[in-house]
Amino acid sequence: MNYKVLLTLCIPFASWAAADYTEQDAMRVQAVKTYIDNVLQEGRSQIKTTPLLADGINTTTRKPVEWIYPDGRTATISNFANQQNFLRALTAMSVVTEDQRYQLEAVRITRYFMDNFIADNELFYWGGHRFVNLDTLELEGPQNKNSVHELKNHYPYYPFLYHVDPHATERYIKAFWQAHVEDWQSLDMGRHGSYSKNYDDKVFHRPIPASLVDQSKLPIMPETKGLTFINAGSDLIYAAYQLDWLAPSANAQGSAAWGQYLMTQYKLAKHPKTGAPVYQFTSPKKREWPPQSDKDTNSKYGDRAARQFGPELGDIAREGNVLFKSNDKSIVFNNALIELHLAEQRNDAAIREQVVDALLNFYRLAYNPENGTIKPIFSDGTSIEGIPLARDGYYGPKGRVFNAHKPKTEEYLLPILRAYRLQADPELWQLAANMTHHYGWGSLGNDAKAKPTLNMQLSSVSPMTLFSAIELYQITQQPEYLEFARAAADKLVEKRFVRGYFLANPRYLNASIDAIEPLALLTLDATLKGKTAQVAPYLSGSGYIHGEFAGKENAYDTNEIYKQTR
């Protein structure tokens, strides 16, 4: 791995001295090795001999998983966009074992994909609605989604892709923006990109327009045809900044400037009084008169939140202001991790402060420190907790009730700790201390200098437990956090390493090869060996395929395939 790639694969914070390494530490790495070996052996086609891998494996039959079309036809799924954390795990395995075979395997897989599955307009054939049939090498996709290009919270491993093929990676990022932005003056963009839209090598040469968001009109947002979901926008932002980082000699391309412009629109659209972040910075423009039935929620009929909540809540009822129904997670988990990574990578104080403000303003409104739950709110703080929906709509059927929820894992905690590592705001520490208390961790103490009292016998752990504990160790250098991470890692292997794969529930039948557990375990091992900075950081990443599946019109593989039970 050359010096430039090493820099781009790194977590920018320092690696500290190695800890004493034990036999138990080695056993955890052996579990990951077994998992990787199983994926590489059982995840390949028995019909077509290629380096490509299936997205998942049936842990009973040991065969690749399949997409089932409404007519009963099946296709073995190989979606490279849904395998990016597996690539990160392969490169991390080479770091901790000093065995380059794993990274070379990652190169082989990546090169084959990039040599064979790029469209004429330079888009990759991957994402939420497009994949390769592993057994035929034909392109596939759910029929009701028109096989469009879509990335939402995917966050590809761009530094590694660039290492393998700089030319294809650069052209892909340009094509990604070209395909998803319909109007560059209004930044009318959408989550769906066309494979037939022409490639433009000078896509980032366009002049930056004036900001679209007029803060004097908030909470009413400007109207566009496209849907500016932050889970799609953050992938565009990340890609633009990564192109600038990886190819700085081509800085005149303006990719970072466009990434900053898009990021700024979300910032400008935050609520003017509470400062709470938003999910969109525009509202869908009404292009047709809505039907009588509220169950038809196509965005061409206008803002779905205004239709469903407007009569009761007024102007705040806009899609961008909705901070529930998983919108909050996309903002304060996925997007926060990406922007924190960019802030650290570029040493950009403005991005860092923007993320810290968004996190604090959201949790001041939504978080209940008494029980560790998060309320369903709009960006002005209006809560709909316990209130039945008055009518059918995009956010659920009439009568549905949204309640406060406690995240099942520490995913909301992780960005708070990463933010604190970059900007030691005492309010962030107190928030983290309260959250960990409700997860049964014990006590972090009043500040980062305090000696923690930690529960080494957690009954429930996840990869987020490990990542969060590692952040605390990086922040404090307190050995208790490292021992806590080791104990959590042992429990993680005990509970989730099942039939040679990592499963969130041992009763699940199919294992995704993009499981996060291996990267979490290898990040811990790298930390123990003083090699944290050589391992690719965890940036979330939520790969999926969405569309018609086995007779269901609106299905996700994450539910229909990976939550099947034995």
Predicted regions and their residues:
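Sec-dependent signal peptide recognition
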Residues: 1-8
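A ubiquitous, low-specificity "background" feature that marks scattered single residues
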Residues: 8-10, 520
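Glycan-recognition and catalytic cores of secretory/periplasmic carbohydrate-active enzymes
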Residues: 18-566
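Hydrophobic h-region of N-terminal signal peptides that target proteins for export
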Residues: 10-17
